[in-house]
């Protein structure tokens, strides 16, 4: 089979003549100084914020909340925001705390509003994440809390992250996180919550006796502690799961 003959794109021979015989001039095109056109002005931050807020339906803030109720250390962190935005974020954070136990869904939306306005602040993402945990929005909570931990490296966030992983069906991941935490950097409440989460993971993995061991601690005997009922309920549930429900409860001795 003969190879097809190659043909140039045009039958016209290429010219060896340069495009122009006129030598280039070293003289500038104009003696006038060249003026650069200014860049388009960036839209005002306030306008950007208003546009973003319009896309997000924020919950109403009770009229009695001023934002001044927020802890001073948190208010200080809001000083990097525009004044009006800082005031709005402060009010949302106060409302979040106010509704956290009585109306978790409303607290959740206040947290999302604050995060939408000030997502670059670790404390805002942390509070929003905790509210999401309380409302059972564990996927949202995990995103918020991981972002907060990346920004602040606050160990107090890790027990909540572990709880989210467990709730999302990742008990091994939750135990891995729990094992990486230096518990001496946690408050008593955070340590107890971490024990409860870890024990729940053990039960889900079929490690019933390990769950009982995890919950066996001196805090079981602290009747007036705020975590008392939750800890004792978790301990009793672990005993039942391990078929040891007839054992004497340690706080009854």
Could you describe each region identified by the protein language model?
Residues 100-102, 135, 168, 205, ...:
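Structural motif corresponding to the intra-repeat A-B loop/turn of tetratricopeptide repeats
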Residues 80-116, 127, 133:
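Alpha-helical segment of the N-proximal tetratricopeptide repeat
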Residues 95, 127-128, 161, 198, ...:
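Structural register within alpha-helical repeat arrays
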Residues 78-84, 112-119, 146-153, 180-188, ...:
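Solenoid-like repeat scaffolds
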Residues 1-76:
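Basic Arg/Gly/Lys-rich low-complexity intrinsically disordered segments
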């Amino acid at each position: 089979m003969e190879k097809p003959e190659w043909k140039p794109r045009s039958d016209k021979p290429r010219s060896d003549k340069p495009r122009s015989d006129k030598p280039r001039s070293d003289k500038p095109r104009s003696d006038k100084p060249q003026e650069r056109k200014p860049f388009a002005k960036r839209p005002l931050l306030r306008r950007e914020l208003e546009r973003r807020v319009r896309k997000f339906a924020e919950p109403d803030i009770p009229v009695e909340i001023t934002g001044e109720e927020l802890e001073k250390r948190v208010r200080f962190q809001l000083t990097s925001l525009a004044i009006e935005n800082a005031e709005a974020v402060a009010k949302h954070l106060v409302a979040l705390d106010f509704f956290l136990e009585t109306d978790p869904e409303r607290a959740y939306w206040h947290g999302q509003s604050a995060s939408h306005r000030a997502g670059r602040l670790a404390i805002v993402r942390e509070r929003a994440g905790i509210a999401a945990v309380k409302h059972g929005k564990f996927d949202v909570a995990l995103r918020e809390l991981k972002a907060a931990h990346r920004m602040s490296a606050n160990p107090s966030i890790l027990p909540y992250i572990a709880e989210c992983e467990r709730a999302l069906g990742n008990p091994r991941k939750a135990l891995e996180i729990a094992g990486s935490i230096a518990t001496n950097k946690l408050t008593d409440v955070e340590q107890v919550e971490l024990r409860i989460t870890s024990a729940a993971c053990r039960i889900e993995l079929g490690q019933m006796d390990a769950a009982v061991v995890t919950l066996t601690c001196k805090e079981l005997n602290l009747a007036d502690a705020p975590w008392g009922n939750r800890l004792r309920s978790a301990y009793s549930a672990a005993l039942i799961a391990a078929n040891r429900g007839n054992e004497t409860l340690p706080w009854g001795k």
